[in-house]
């Protein structure tokens, strides 16, 4: 992004108007099921662009150990940030009004924090 997309976006004056991101609620377990690892929740997301408050980690990095307070059994780790919180933050930046966020992020009402604050 730093060496490919950003110079082009800067050249055309769009560096603060374009945001690149990955989004998934898919993860893997810490343990093997004999054929690999099973499906689980959580993962690392990437957000890049001129309007991103970068250089920070949003959420809490869990202790990746069986039996830790983050692990709920079967090697499954509970994420500290919901995919819907992530989506709602981006949707707000795109201009979606707060009352409409549940159309984009259906479970956003389950969280005290709707906007994670990573967009300017």
State where each predicted segment sits:
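Substrate-binding rim/cap in mid-to-C-terminal beta-strand-loop elements of soluble/periplasmic
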Residues: 42-74
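Metal-dependent active-site segment of extracytoplasmic phospho-/sulfohydrolases and closely related
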Residues: 9-34
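Short, small-residue-biased leader/transition segments that mark boundaries at the very start
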Residues: 2-6
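Extracellular/periplasmic catalytic domains that process cell-envelope and extracellular macromolecules
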Residues: 13-16, 37-41, 51
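Short, well-ordered loop/turn and helix-capping segments at boundaries between secondary-structure elements
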Residues: 32, 51-53, 92, 96
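Hydrophobic, well-ordered secondary-structure elements that form the walls
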Residues: 25, 45, 90
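Short, solvent-exposed loop/turn and secondary-structure capping segments
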Residues: 32-35, 57-58, 102
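Membrane-interface soluble catalytic domains
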Residues: 10-15, 65-120
């Amino acid at each position: 992004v730093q060496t490919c997309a950003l110079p082009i976006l800067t050249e055309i004056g769009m560096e603060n108007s374009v945001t690149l991101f990955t989004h998934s609620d898919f993860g893997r377990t810490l343990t093997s099921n004999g054929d690999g690892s099973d499906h689980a929740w959580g993962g690392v997301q990437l957000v890049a662009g001129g309007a991103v408050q970068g250089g920070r980690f949003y959420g809490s990095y869990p202790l990746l150990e069986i039996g830790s307070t983050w692990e709920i059994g079967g090697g499954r780790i509970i994420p500290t940030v919901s995919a819907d919180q992530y989506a709602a933050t981006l949707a707000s930046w795109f201009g979606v009004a707060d009352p409409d966020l549940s159309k984009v992020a259906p479970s956003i009402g389950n969280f005290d924090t709707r906007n994670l604050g990573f967009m300017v």
